[in-house]
């Protein structure tokens, strides 16, 4: 059972636990920026820097395997050219999946707990127009 399903559990404590696991598994004590890349955007992480570590999301408290096509089951730590570290969240939960808001915002809470002061969110928005494929940029 995901610990966020327990209504008595403190979601901020679970985010701190998740951040501790991420620090342990990546060897990176603090991340400076976090990115949630929408469907089709995973390759963007490959060009922003050097991957330090890739973690199976199910090994991190509060995260689970993605239920949406195009999402990755991973959390990555990337060293940027300026020496800072980016946390890339491939696994996340959408509200329409029916797990509640606590699981939806867990990635952002965890990113903040890792030290990230900047969060970049992207989405695939593939359902808006049939001619758009995964990764089509929309502003």
Cite the ranges covered by each PLM segment.
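Metabolite-binding pocket within alpha/beta catalytic cores that recognizes anionic/polar moieties
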Residues: 2-139
